[in-house]
Amino acid sequence: MAPWLELVFDVPLDKSFTYRACAAHAGEALVGRRVLAPFGARTLIGFVISESHSSPADCGGAVGTFKEIIRVIDREALFDQTHLACARWMAHFYLCALGQALCAVVPSRKRERTLSSFASCAGVRRTDTYALSGEQRKAIDAITASTGARSFYVHGVTGSGKTEVFLRAAEAVLARGKSVIYLVPEIALTHQVLQEVYVRFGSQAAVLHSALSGSQRLGEWRRIQCMRHCVVIGARSAIFAPLKRLGLVIMDEEHDSSYKSAHVPRYHARQVAMYRCADANCPFVMGSATPSVEAWYAMLRGAVRRLPLTARVAGGAPPRVEVVDVSKEALLLSTRLVDEIRKTKEAGYQSMLFLNRRGFSYSFQCRSCGYTLCCTQCAVPLTWHKRVGAMQCHYCGRQEAPPESCPCCHSFDTRYGGVGTEYIEEAVQALFPEYRIARVDTDALRSGHVQQTMEQFRAGKIDVLLGTQMIAKGFNFPTLRLVGIACADTGLHTPDFRAAERSFALMMQVAGRAGRYVDNGLVIIQTRNPAHPAVVCAQHGDCESFYAQELAQREALCFPPFVRLIRFVFRSKTRRKAKDAAYAAHALLTAQMPLGADVLGPAACVVAQVAGSYRMQILLRAPSFPVVQQVARSFLDEFRAPAGVYVESDVDPVNVL
C-alpha cells in the first residue's frame, strides 16, 4: 500500500495534515519533497515532513476521510532534516506555523532555471593582495583557530579592511574542506564585495538573493545541494543555503535592519545564523563600523569576542568632520557646503551628498487651513515626485496627480514642504550647471541603474553623487573627498527607541566613504540639533561614548538589550474592529503576565493606517525571553480574532512604527 504522508502548508495553522500518496509514487521516499494537494476548496503546495506505512486507522482515524495528493513536484528532496530542524526552531522562536517557516527556508518555484551567478563580474581580475596589518592578522588567526560555535565581531572603522579579514578566513575554512555562507545586506549595493568573492573563489561561489526569480533561485539551490558550490554569498535568505559541512558564517554590516524579515516568519538572519552555527559547531563572524546596540552589549558581556581594526588599510588620517548648524540658513545647502563642493571639484576630486528621503518634496500643505495631502489608504503624507509628475505613497505605492488648490478649503495658497533627493539634485544642478551629477535612491534601484551609476562614479565620470542610505553601504571610491549630510535630523526624532542608533550609524557609515584614498577628506554634517549626542559622537567618531549613553538610556527606560520585546499588531479595514480586538487582547495578556513583565498599550501604531487597514499595537516586555515567549504563545493559542481582524506577531522587532 502507498505510504501515508504528513504535510505542512504555508498557512497560519500550527498543525500538520495526513494525506495518502498517489499510487504512482508507491515505494518512493517523499520526505523533503513538495507535493500538490487539495486543501479545502484550494489546491496548495505542501511539504512532506514524514511518511508512514501504518494506516491512520491504527490510530483511530477513518481511512476514507483522508485525501490523496495530486502529484509530486520535486524529483529529489528539496530539504533535509537539518532544514526541517531549523524550520521547527524558527516556528517555535518566531511564533509562526511550521509550514510558514519551511516556506521561508526553501525556494518556492516549481521549475529550475540556469543562472550565471557572477555574470556581472566577468572580466574582473584579482588584484595583488596587500600585506595584512597586525590587527587584521590577529583577527584572522582568532577566527581560524576557533573550535566550536564561537561568535566574533570584527569591529573596525570604515576602510579598515574588514572584507579582507572575512575573505582570508573563508579561504582557510575552504582549505579544510568545509563551506562558507557570506551574508550582505543588499546584493544590488554590494557589487564590489561580489567582485572580490568572484576573483577569490570563482565557480566555487554562488549567489542567492531576492532579485533572483523563483526558478533561478531553485536552480542555484539544486547546484548547492549537489556540492557544485562551497561558498554562498547573498542577502538575508542566503542563511538557509543547503551547504554541506558548514564551517563558517559571515555577516557583513551586522547593524543593517534589512537582515530582519518584514514578513512571516519575521526572522532576523543574525539569530538564524547563530542557530545554524551552533548546529554545525562552527564560528559565526559579524562585522561593522557601527555595531547594533545589541551586538555591542554582547561584546561588553563577553558573549561575543571583539576583534578591533583601528586603522584604514590605505593609510592616512580619517576625514575631518564639521557640524554646521543650519537653523539660520535660508537654503537647504549651507554656504559652507556649497563652497566645499566647488573647491573639491576644482581640486579634481568628487563629492557625495546624502539625504535619507527620496522624492522632490515631502508633502503638499495648505497655508490657509493647514491641510496636508495624505494617502487615502495610509496615514502618511504623499510625497511629490517631480520626475513622474505625481504624488506617491511610499507605503502602498499609490499615486495621484498633484492638486491645483487645497482639496479642503480650495485655497491656492499652498506649498510643498520638506525636501527629497530629487530636490537636492535640482538645487545642485542650478548651483553647478557644468557639473556631472547623478542620483541614487530606491527609485533608481528599481530602474536597475544603481550599479552602472556607481561604476561611473568610481571611474570619475560623475562629479557629485546624490543619494539616500543606500550610498552608505560598502562602496570604495578612490577620488571621493567630500561627503555632505544634508539633513542629519531626518531620523533623529522618529518615535522609535532605535532612532538615535539608526541616525548615528547612518552618519558614521556615510562619513566613512570620504577620503579613503585622499589625505584631506572632509565630512560636513548639516543639522538643527548640533548638541544631540548622536551628532556629537558621529562628529568625533566616538562609538564608545555613544553606546555608553545609549545603553544607559535604554536601561533606564527598560528597552532592549536589557529586556526582550514581542510586538502584536491588530489590523482591520474597520477602525473599531482593530481597536476592540486590541483591547480584548490587552485584557487577556494582562491576566497572563507574570511578575516582572508588563504590557505596553494598546495604542495606535505610529503609522496608524497602511493599505487601507487600521493598525493598533501591543508590546510585551520582560527581562527574560522564555517568559515573554511563553505568554505570547499562550495568548496566540487562546485568542480568537474577530472576523476581519488580522494579528501579526513580531519577536524582537527592529522598529515599532
Curated annotation (Swiss-Prot):
Helicase C-terminal domain location: 390-570
Positions contributing to Zn(2+) 1 binding: 366, 369, 406, 409
Key words of the record: ATP-binding, DNA replication, DNA-binding, Helicase, Hydrolase, Isomerase, Metal-binding, Nucleotide-binding, Primosome, Zinc
GO molecular function, one term: 3'-5' DNA helicase activity
Limits of the Helicase ATP-binding domain: 143-309
Amino acids binding Zn(2+) 2: 375, 378, 393, 396
Residues engaged in binding ATP: 156-163
Subunit structure: Component of the replication restart primosome.
Function: Initiates the restart of stalled replication forks, which reloads the replicative helicase on sites other than the origin of replication. Recognizes and binds to abandoned replication forks and remodels them to uncover a helicase loading site. Promotes assembly of the primosome at these replication forks.
Protein name as catalogued: Replication restart protein PriA
Gene: priA
